[in-house]
Regions:
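Ferredoxin-type iron-sulfur electron-transfer modules and their immediate structural context
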Residues: 6-18, 22, 26-27, 63-65, ...
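Short acidic, hydrophobic short linear motifs in intrinsically disordered regions
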Residues: 104-116
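Short amphipathic alpha-helical interaction segments
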Residues: 116-132
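Glycine-rich dinucleotide-binding loop and its adjacent helix/turn
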Residues: 487-508, 534, 567-587, 611-665, ...
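A Rossmann-like FAD-binding core segment of flavoenzymes
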Residues: 563-612, 625-642, 664-774
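A short, conserved structural fragment
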Residues: 131-142, 364-365, 917
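Short, amphipathic alpha-helical interaction segments positioned at domain boundaries
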Residues: 145-184
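Beta1-alpha1 glycine-rich phosphate/pyrophosphate-binding loop at the start
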Residues: 426-429, 435-436, 477-481, 517-585, ...
Length: 955
């Protein structure tokens, strides 16, 4: 009816209907931003919340739209999201009152009585009702401290207020669309004309306090402390309207929106009295700021009232923040940036990537420190972002994909090859430097940023970082893995182990969504680690009685002692993960039963627990087994001796493990037969050498033809046929044989190590999870989400048999996806680190001076090996060896900051452990704060300067 609000978008707020409408809207709906002389099309998020404008719209609401919007571009059109937002927020009578109020002019109660002619009690109630809704704000900013009401601008203003109370937003989701557009559309043409300081528009970045506390040239308004002093005792924490809005539209960042924004002064009273927040102490404000910095959130202050007033300090996630979007989408940093610019001291920088990962603007990227031949023997110059200051600017200069583009970590020309080659992208150069300085705790913490199992990997990793090491072009690669093993030994001692702190994007201390991880192998353990670090209490279901998967039941204990696994699992347990052993999901409990228990997401990482046979006669005999079963029996302590002759079929690292175990269990003859030539063998050269040292023989170029049995049905031998080719011309596995060239060998047992299989059992019964080649689960390659939305997969069940470090990397990414999945309205893809690393060209690098020391080698204790053949016998580096080896690192990489993109937030300085990045006050003009009412003069003055530069080509 004409005088009433339309509640809840005609009932469309019901979540099921919204989800289906959201999916339909995203399928193909676009919207057009229109302004004088331009048109720009983009996905129309939130379109499902905006019904068509009625044939006969409410006249009072149409007038209110005209009164509160259409101010800069003077549009003639009536936009649906504006109309419906005001229609749901205001009665016609309220709209008429609002249209009588001038924007940003305060009115006391007597003034409102005079303005409207309404009785005092009636108008006061209406004003309070509209304040509660968010159409008005109020303060006491007058000499008499009399309450006065203000019709705020839309942004920052009523658009935020409409989104700040979650219950109201859920009832009226069109408010989310309104806020999203009100903070973008009106600015789309004006942004290139915005001068340094922001011209009284929106928000302004204020640096991390400790990043500028020593800056002698700073001015008070650049310090958070200045504003906290100014509003001492008047603080309130409130819901972040940007996070709430984006979440409703399905583009949330998985942050809990509550309590990230800090209202100050009279605004604190407003948000508390209108149920948008609660009072906090100064110490609580500090805690919010600290936690925001830990999470990589940008501090911003309101910038519409000049240099003597703000009303909020926000802690913003660039993936959802509409204020930061103004500078990032339009590539116009004047709308955000502070007076400061980050600068890197390359001599100190070790390309750890911490500053890159946290930079909201994509200003910091990894590059190289080594000189380049192509650059004339100098360090390469890196491109800078073009700016609108002296350039014509339209939508072709915008960055609509900025949330992902800003998360690309590396310049195209590349960075340190070790970090690039590592599947987990561990900061190798960084932890080598920390180890060189004796800062072992910090080195371990840095490693665990990407690898929660460094003690394990220090023993079993296939060392792709070393294969890529630039030092290998000089003499021998740095012994990276041995240094990592030395550092990670600290995890084996409760007194020195590193248990990471929880860094969670919620002020509630953690998240209560239940997440099930199925399988306690490296992928599952990694996922559990990073979910626990994010504030969850994941539950790990493991069908065996011990954790580790193939780490425990596949890798020989003389390579990886099981107490190492237990020590690193204990860290994950201390972080809050729960382990339930002896539970096979699908048999003992189903996924549906776990859902009924409240589990919201599942990470399936059960590995490849089965083996494969060759399909030849005689292989079904009792003494023929597959490698994974053989290794499981040995590692479970069920095999004490293995007399006689053991023949191993296969040439990979698993086959090597079988052969070495057989040698140590007393087999009088152990021989491996593989299809490949010696040069083609999958097993590494080092692994082959160790097997031969143990007494194994290796015969290359043979494939199994038949297993021979004696009269009792027991294995007595096996015949092989000559393999003439393993791969076809396309590189596909297609072995060919010479059937006339045969070789028979005696055998008491045969172990097939020619592949592994996935044993699903009933785990996926009734699910939509698709299976591909080799029965591996099908999933999105970035998010690891399957066709069953709450099921994610990783490790060998997705890739097939691979290495522990690959599974660890996958588990980390799955944790990111699962965190986003279980948080309402979050996107799984937008704004996550892209993991797009590129290695510098080692052939182009100029290497002139370096430490001439040779590569250190870990001591092998042969006496211990003889006395205890199933105990580790390769010793850890000494501290002296670590110092010598880390000195061999060439320090290939460094972070590069583009000053044109830097917004001066200072977050990079909070992450650097090397004091290599600082803020310099290079742009003092960016601290020019003016009132909103000075916007047009400020824009006009700067636009004139800019036009002159463009016309005459000045910079």
């Amino acid at each position: 009816m004409a005088g009433e609000r339309h509640g809840g978008m005609l009932g469309l707020q019901k979540r099921g209907a919204l989800q289906s409408r959201r999916a339909a809207a995203r399928e193909g709906t676009t919207m057009i931003l229109n302004g004088p002389g331009f048109s720009y099309t983009e996905p129309d998020i939130g379109a499902e919340f905006v019904p068509p404008i009625p044939e006969h719209p409410r006249e009072a609401i149409v007038k209110l739209c005209e009164h509160c919007t259409n101010r800069l571009l003077h549009r003639d059109e009536l936009l649906g999201y504006e109309y419906w937002s005001f229609a749901e927020a205001a009665t016609d009578e309220q709209a008429e009152v609002l249209c009588k109020m001038k924007m940003r002019r305060p009115y006391t109660l007597p003034e409102m009585v005079k303005l409207t002619g309404m009785p005092e009690a009636d108008i006061e109630k209406m004003l309070d009702d509209m304040s509660y809704t968010g159409l008005l704000e109020y303060n006491w900013e007058n000499p008499e401290r009399a309450k006065q009401w203000v019709l705020p601008m839309l942004v920052p203003g009523s658009a935020e207020f409409l989104n700040m109370r979650v219950s109201q937003l859920e009832e009226h989701p069109v408010y989310a669309k309104f806020f999203e557009q009100a903070s973008k559309g009106p600015l789309s043409k004006a942004t290139p004309m915005v001068p340094p300081g922001g011209a009284g528009i929106g928000m302004h970045v204020i640096p991390v306090e400790k990043a500028i506390d020593a800056a002698s040239t700073s001015v008070p308004i650049e310090h958070i402390e200045h504003w906290l002093d100014k509003y001492e005792g008047k603080y309130a924490a409130s819901t972040c309207s940007c996070r709430a809005s984006r979440r409703v539209m399905g583009e949330g960042c998985a942050d809990d929106p509550a309590d990230w924004c800090i209202a100050v002064g009279d605004m604190a009273d407003y948000v508390v009295e209108t149920d948008r927040g609660h009072y906090v102490t100064r110490d609580e404000v500090y805690d919010i700021l600290r936690q925001a910095e830990d999470n990589g959130f940008v501090h911003q202050i309101t910038n519409i009232d000049g240099e003597n007033k703000i009303f909020a300090i926000c802690n913003c996630n660039v993936n959802v923040c509409y204020a930061l979007r103004t500078s990032q989408l339009f590539n116009t940093p004047n709308l955000s940036r502070s007076a400061y610019v980050a600068k890197v001291e390359k001599d100190k920088c070790v390309a750890c990537g911490r500053c890159v990962e946290v930079c909201p603007a994509g200003a910091a990227k990894l590059g190289q420190k080594l000189c380049s031949k192509k650059a004339g023997g100098r360090v390469p110059e890196y491109p800078r972002q073009e700016l609108p200051d002296a350039t014509k600017w339209d939508h072709t200069k915008w960055s609509p994909n900025y949330r992902n583009d800003n998360r690309i970590e590396t310049h195209e020309s590349g960075t340190a090859p070790c970090k690039t080659a590592c599947p987990a992208h561990v900061a190798v150069q960084g932890y080598l430097k920390l180890a060189a300085q004796g800062r072992y705790d910090e080195a371990l913490a840095l490693i665990k940023r990407e690898n929660p199992l460094p003690a394990i990997c220090g023993r079993v990793c296939n060392r792709r970082c070393e294969d890529a090491c630039t030092r290998g072009r000089v003499d021998a690669a740095v012994a990276i893995d041995e240094v990592k093993k030395f550092i990670a030994q600290r995890d084996l001692d409760a007194a020195t182990r590193y248990v990471p702190p929880v860094v969670t994007p919620t002020r509630a201390g953690g998240f209560d969504q239940k997440i099930a991880i199925i399988g306690a192998g490296p992928a599952g353990l990694s996922c559990a680690f990073y979910l626990a670090e994010k504030g969850y209490k994941p539950v790990v279901f493991e069908k065996n009685e011990r954790p580790g998967g193939m780490l425990t039941y596949g890798i020989p204990s003389f390579k990886l002692q099981k107490d190492v696994i237990e020590a690193e699992v204990e860290v994950i347990r201390l972080m809050g993960a729960e382990f339930r052993y002896g539970v096979e999901v699908g048999r003992d409990v189903t996924l549906d039963e776990l859902r009924a228990q409240g589990f919201k997401a599942f990470y399936v990482a059960i590995g490849c627990q089965g083996g494969r046979l060759a399909g030849i006669p005689g292989e079904d005999a009792e003494d023929v087994t597959v490698a994974v079963d053989f290794l499981r029996e040995v590692n479970s302590g069920k095999v004490d001796a293995l007399p006689g002759r053991t023949i191993v079929v296969g040439g990979g690292n698993v086959a090597i493990d079988v052969a070495r175990n057989a040698c140590r269990l007393g087999s009088e003859h152990v021989e491996m037969f593989c299809l490949e030539s010696e040069a083609q063998m999958p097993a590494s050269v080092e692994e082959r050498r160790e097997a031969i040292e143990d007494g194994a023989h290796i015969s290359c170029g043979w494939g199994p033809k038949e297993v021979h049995l004696d009269e009792a049905g027991r294995v007595c031998g096996i015949t092989f046929k000559r393999c003439t080719r393993v791969m076809d011309d396309e590189g596909r596995f297609a072995p060919e044989y010479d059937e006339s060239d045969l070789r028979r060998v005696d055998a008491d047992r045969v172990v097939m190590s020619i592949g592994q299989s996935i044993v699903w059992g009933d785990l996926l019964a009734g699910s939509k999870v698709g299976l591909g080649r080799g029965q591996g689960a099908l999933a999105d390659p970035q998010t690891y989400q399957t066709a069953e939305p709450d099921i994610f997969v990783g490790g060998d069940v997705y890739t097939g048999p691979s290495f522990a470090i690959d599974a660890i990397a996958a588990g980390h990414e799955a944790a990111v996806s699962i965190h986003r999945f279980v948080q309402p309205g979050s996107t799984l893809t937008i704004g996550r680190n892209q993991r797009r690393y590129a290695a510098l060209d080692r052939d182009d690098a100029v290497i002139e001076s370096y430490d001439n020391a040779s590569r250190e080698v870990a001591h092998v204790d042969r006496e211990r090996e003889k006395a205890a053949p199933f105990s580790e016998y390769v010793e850890t580096f000494t501290e002296e060896q670590v110092r010598a080896e880390t000195a061999r690192c060439l320090g290939c990489g460094a972070s590069i900051v583009d000053p044109n993109k830097c917004i001066g937030c200072g977050l990079c300085t909070t992450k650097c452990a090397f004091d290599a990045i600082h803020l310099d006050r290079d742009r003092p003009e960016c601290s020019t704060m003016v009132k909103y009412e000075q916007k047009l003069p400020s824009l006009g003055k700067y636009a004139l300067k800019r036009a002159i530069k463009i016309k005459f080509g000045r910079k």
